[in-house]
């Protein structure tokens, strides 16, 4: 890459202190590999237990008296934690707002196609913003736009809830927001 230097990012600090990093304490409350409590032991004893097991001594709660340490494979622990966070993120559904535009003179065929798309969006769990756009002399017949919105409201009442219904026209359009019903 030509040009400037890339900024060096500092190495990530571990959230927990490991093996030789645990200093300033003489005794620790030790938890074994399978989660059972060993009791209060000296720091050197705890390090020996971790060394003989071939894993790490990890300081879990440094503020406790005495500090709580656990014998575990730290790399595996971090991997499991990252895997759990990834699973949690995957389960979290991102709700999007889709928009469908109508005109006061939208014919029945176009209306049916747009209604089918709208129901598809709602079944996916997305919110739908329905916009009625007015042009020219259509502004004088706003009641036709309200009729279209009421018809949509009636056609989608079994699987959608109206979040906001327009009380008046905003600029040259009316906007209604539909949300999927909770199952």
Curated annotation (Swiss-Prot):
Any one GO BP annotation for this protein: ribosome disassembly
Pfam families documented for this protein: IF3_C (PF00707), IF3_N (PF05198)
Domain of life: Bacteria
The entry's keywords: Cytoplasm, Initiation factor, Protein biosynthesis
Any one GO molecular-function label of the UniProt entry: ribosome binding
Cellular compartments annotated: Cytoplasm
GO cellular component, one term: cytosol
Function: IF-3 binds to the 30S ribosomal subunit and shifts the equilibrium between 70S ribosomes and their 50S and 30S subunits in favor of the free subunits, thus enhancing the availability of 30S subunits on which protein synthesis initiation begins.
Similarity comment: family membership: Belongs to the IF-3 family.
Self-association and partners: Monomer.
Protein name, per record: Translation initiation factor IF-3
Source organism of the structure: Aliivibrio salmonicida (strain LFI1238) (Vibrio salmonicida (strain LFI1238))
């Amino acid at each position: 890459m030509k040009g400037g230097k890339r900024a060096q990012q500092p190495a990530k600090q571990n959230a927990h202190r490991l093996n030789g990093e645990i200093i300033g304490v003489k005794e620790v409350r030790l938890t074994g590999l399978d989660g059972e409590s060993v009791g209060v032991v000296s720091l050197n004893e705890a390090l020996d237990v971790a060394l003989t097991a071939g894993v790490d001594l990890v300081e879990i709660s440094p503020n406790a008296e005495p500090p709580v340490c656990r014998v575990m494979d730290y790399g595996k622990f971090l991997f499991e934690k990252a895997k759990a966070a990834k699973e949690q993120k995957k389960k979290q559904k991102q709700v999007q707002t889709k928009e469908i535009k109508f005109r006061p003179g939208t014919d029945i065929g176009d209306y049916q196609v747009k209604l089918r798309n709208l129901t598809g969006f709602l079944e996916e769990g997305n919110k739908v913003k329905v916009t009625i756009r007015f042009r020219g002399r259509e502004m004088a017949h706003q009641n036709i736009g309200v009729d279209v919105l009421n018809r949509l409201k009636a056609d989608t009442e079994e699987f959608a809830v109206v979040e906001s219904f327009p009380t008046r026209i905003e600029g040259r359009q009316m906007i209604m927001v539909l949300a999927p019903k909770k199952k």
